Amino acid sequence: MTEFSPREIVSELDRYIVGHAEAKKAVAVALRNRWRRRRVPADLRDEVTPKNILLIGPTGVGKTEIARRLAKLAQAPFLKVEATKFTEVGYVGRDVDQIVRDLVESALAMVREKRRAAVKAKAEGGAEERILDALTGPGSTAARESFRKKLRAGELDDKEVELQLADTGGPSFDIPGQPGAAVFNLSDMMKSLGGGRTKTHKTTVSGAWAPLIAEESDKLLDQEALTQEALELAENHGIVFLDEIDKVASSSQRSGADVSREGVQRDLLPLIEGTTVSTKYGPVKTDHILFIASGAFHVAKPSDLLPELQGRLPIRVELKGLSRDDMRRILTEPEANLIRQHQALMATEEVTLVFTDEAIDALADAAVAVNGSVENIGARRLQTVMEKVVEEISFTAADRGGETVTIDAAYVQERVGALAANADLSRFIL
């Protein structure tokens, strides 16, 4: 779990996302409160529940990007799901309990990776012995030592070996009517009966290291303790980002078949409030899982959500639409901005791509103009405009090695000016 202060979290998010100070503060405080709760006296710890957040803002302003960056920062089990993927219990589709099961899988992967790193040195020794067994056979000590030296020197990396590895890719199937038994894997069942199957793999020595180290690490790990730690991590530090929550809100203007829209909201209520969900690793309490919901609310309004669900998302943050200045900053400020990405792509062909300040202004103007005349899709419009501008250069770059190509305002106008000005053309091309 990360120990960044709220200010550090915000400055970390600032490296990738332009503006939205209020939203960044809200998620930073929510993340820090997880750390604070662990230090509260034990009698109060269970009473301190996370304050769930609802992010409201037009499409393309950075709601999902905030979640993506937060996931990397949090160092906690994190799951991003679209609310539209779920259906009410009784309909064909995934039920909302699957969110918790996926979160547990994410926690399990995190804990396993951490534990594997701790036993990696020992596991490498076991993997080396198995590769030597495959190369020389179990006996022959003298030949084995000579091969060991060559193996460590990397001289045998391209040699092909045949290995017996655990078979993890057995067929999976659903068991209807079984709560928490969403998907069973035949290999898992065989393993639990004490008969784990193996499969012969042909690979090079260099390709054999990763699967062998993973397998040897798992032999050294206490699987039961690992599962318990993962369940505890998911319960106390899990974060779920529910995207497109507005798509399951029933708009007052929309009539007709409302298949399981409200039902999904009703199913989400106990999950967000706190319930116990059965998973194949054991029961998981959701009382302390942090939920961050987000939606554009173009058609529906936040008030169209069930009142009980609104009450369970107490912190509301509105993200403003992007201005022309924001668009310009998005092109230049984030660490992996679009201009830098395209320059790096062209550099692989030994073409130096230069954007003048006027060209950057023209790109921002074109994106704002098209957003205003057609559909406002926020910063995503910049990608469309940028692709149109560099299309010809990308196509001919392979034949222009060593050249420096300067993109100025006139070039941008030539490529997208007419399209941006003509609403009908923009509708289909930009």
Swiss-Prot record:
Principal cellular location given in the protein's record: cytoplasm
Record GO cellular component, one term: HslUV protease complex
Subcellular location: Cytoplasm
Keywords, sorted A to Z: ATP-binding, Chaperone, Cytoplasm, Nucleotide-binding
Superkingdom assignment: Bacteria
GO BP terms in the entry: protein unfolding; proteolysis involved in protein catabolic process
A GO MF term: ATP binding
Record-stated family: Belongs to the ClpX chaperone family. HslU subfamily.
Subunit structure: A double ring-shaped homohexamer of HslV is capped on each side by a ring-shaped HslU homohexamer. The assembly of the HslU/HslV complex is dependent on binding of ATP.
Function, as annotated: ATPase subunit of a proteasome-like degradation complex; this subunit has chaperone activity. The binding of ATP and its subsequent hydrolysis by HslU are essential for unfolding of protein substrates subsequently hydrolyzed by HslV. HslU recognizes the N-terminal part of its protein substrates and unfolds these before they are guided to HslV for hydrolysis.
Protein name (database record): ATP-dependent protease ATPase subunit HslU
Organism: Caulobacter vibrioides (strain NA1000 / CB15N) (Caulobacter crescentus)
